[in-house]
Swiss-Prot record:
GO terms for biological process: fucose metabolic process. InterPro entries: FucosylTrfase_pln, GDP-Fuc_O-FucTrfase. This is O-fucosyltransferase 37. Glycans are attached at residues 126, 372, 403, 447, 504. It comes from Arabidopsis thaliana. The chain crosses the membrane at residues 53-73. It is found in: Membrane. GO terms for molecular function: glycosyltransferase activity. The gene is OFUT37.
Length: 559
């Protein structure tokens, strides 16, 4: 079974599974078999089924009419076109089925690296209109993944995918989603420079001390296989390119274009055969030619699959959440380093704020920009993460039921369990990976923050609603991935507009709820075009470069 699953998830497998109607047609319209070989040279005689067979066929077709299968076709060098039906009619049966079997039935040949379980929605009984609206999924407007590379790109990639003289080594840093962004850009830069890419090197995280390597977090063979028609990827440098000392290029300016990359490095790479780059985070321009934008999507949503142990555990925890009904995933930025870097107050009281202030004074290098702003100015400008009080009020104002299951993604909050008390007071069903996992399941990932972040990522992707308390790489990655798999609900808090309302004592709870829902009406995960916005990353906004509108779809309600 495991072998068949891997075949299904191979993004180069292009045939489609037979539909239920195909099997029915075989059952009722199979030609009569002749025992004698002499009949093989003659036309088959078919039997005409009796009327009751037609009645049975019609009945069965009605049963299957509610089930949508996700179809996917990917040309090995160029084209992807994915249908992202929610398959909500399967939702009542999934609790008894292994997650990989679910993915097999819903996502043929790996429509994306991660494909979420179907959105559950709320239940109509004893729910207010606000609560129903909160669980309702956005209208995807018929957009589906569609990676159609140009003929020029196909010709170039045919050559680059066989490159054996020029090699690119990239050292990536930061947390999981920073690493993912840099890996995506590394593949694109390898294409620009027409070089083979060595599997990226992960630098030890200076904040958490995570020493994970690429293979600890990601499926290396899947990474190579998915991109084999685009860029040649090797596990290590050949002996002919090993050098005792190699210059590391780490002075890369912001927002560099493909033209700049080639002008700066191609001659050197051609002469030496090796280029080592470091410090890529957000250096490559967001605005790239269409083919390179599509390559970004292919790497982010197809090639970067988590390593099997991480994926398996993430899927287990996801099933445990999903089986209980619809759930919210909150990505809370409450870690100590976040409060230090942002220059914000924790909301936990003077004792905790004093600790943060002292740390900030002793380690000023961690403080981010806008040093001339006071805490109040930072907060009202939207530069501070929402604290737990603000998150609780936001959820209530948006119509989240008080009994909603909430998965808390993120690192250990500064202040420990006390930090979550204001949220737990309003929403009692709070769950973390630590409380969701069985004894010993998280033990292999002790002091491995990137692996734990990957588990959070997997569980969050299948949530009915995702809300980050602050912008950042996780929020952008989740926004784009949820869009790519069918525009799952994603609410980005409008901090600048809502915080003054929360502080205005003359605004009643009912008014706050009305105004908050109005503020976020267009921030529900609907398709948003990147076109015309140079600062938007295609990984967060895959429309229109990586998603096409195939036909008009009406919004699917749950009630």
């Amino acid at each position: 079974m495991a072998k068949s699953m891997r075949t299904i998830k191979n993004p180069f497998f292009t045939s489609h599974p037979p539909s239920p109607f195909f099997h029915l047609s075989l059952l009722f319209f199979t030609p009569l078999k002749k025992s004698s070989p002499r009949y093989l040279n003659h036309h088959h005689q078919t039997r005409c089924p009796p009327p009751q067979f037609f009645l049975l066929l019609i009945s069965l077709s009605l049963v299957f009419s509610g089930i949508s299968f996700l179809t996917f076709s990917l040309d090995t060098g160029s084209s992807t076109c994915v249908s992202t039906s929610s398959a909500s009619s399967l939702k009542f049966f999934i609790s008894d089925v292994d997650h990989r079997q679910i993915l097999t039935s819903l996502a043929v040949s790996g429509a994306s690296t991660l494909f979420p379980l179907p959105a559950r929605g709320g239940h109509s009984g004893n729910m207010t209109e606000e609560e129903k609206e909160f669980w309702k999924q956005p209208n995807g407007e018929g957009y589906k993944p569609c990676l159609d590379f140009s003929l020029e790109y196909k010709k170039k990639s045919a050559s680059v995918s066989k490159e054996k003289k020029r090699f690119l080594v990239v050292v990536v840093s930061g947390g999981l989603n920073q690493q993912r962004n840099q890996i995506v850009d590394a593949v694109v830069i390898a294409m620009i420079l027409e070089a083979a890419l060595v599997v990226p090197v992960l630098q030890v995280n200076r904040v958490w001390g995570d020493e994970s390597e690429f293979s600890d977090l990601f499926d290396v063979e899947h990474f190579k296989k998915t991109l084999r028609s685009d860029v040649r990827i090797v596990s290590s440098l050949p002996s002919t390119h090993l050098m005792s000392r190699q210059t590391i290029e780490n002075q890369i300016p912001w927002d560099v274009s493909p033209v700049w990359i080639r002008a700066k490095y191609f001659k050197q790479l051609n002469e030496e055969g090796l280029l080592v780059l470091k410090g890529l985070d957000s250096k490559l321009a967001k605005n790239l030619p269409p083919d390179l934008q599509k390559l970004r999507c292919k790497v982010a949503f197809h090639a970067l699959r988590f390593a099997a142990p991480i994926e398996n555990l993430g899927n287990k925890l996801t099933r445990r959440m999903w089986i209980e009904g619809p759930y919210i995933a909150l990505h809370l930025r409450l870690e100590k380093d976040v409060w230090v870097r942002t220059g914000c107050l924790t909301g936990l009281g003077s004792e905790f704020d004093r600790i943060i202030a002292e740390t900030r004074t002793s380690q000023p290098r961690y403080l981010t920009g806008r040093l001339n702003l006071t805490y109040t100015e930072r907060r009202l400008a939207g530069f501070c993460p929402l604290n737990v009080y603000e998150i609780a009020r936001l959820l209530k104002a948006l119509g989240a039921p008080s009994n909603a299951s909430i998965y808390i993604a993120g690192g250990e909050p500064f202040g420990g369990s006390r930090a979550l008390e204001p949220l737990a007071k309003e929403f009692s069903n709070l769950v973390t990976k630590e409380t969701l996992a069985h004894k010993g399941e998280l033990l292999p990932y002790t002091n491995r923050s990137s692996a734990l972040a990957a588990i959070d990522y997997i569980v969050s992707l299948s949530s009915d609603v995702f809300i980050p308390s602050h912008g950042g790489n996780m929020a952008k990655a989740m926004q784009g991935n949820r869009a790519y798999v069918g525009h799952r609900k994603f609410i980005m808090p409008n901090k600048r507009a809502m915080l003054p309302l929360m502080e205005n004592s003359s605004v009643s709870d009912a008014e706050l709820s009305f105004l908050t829902r109005k503020l976020h009406r267009k921030s529900q995960g609907y398709p948003e075009s990147r076109r015309g916005r140079r600062d938007r990353d295609v990984i967060a906004y895959p429309v229109p470069e990586c998603m096409c509108r195939h036909r008009k779809h009406r919004s699917v309600g749950f009630f």
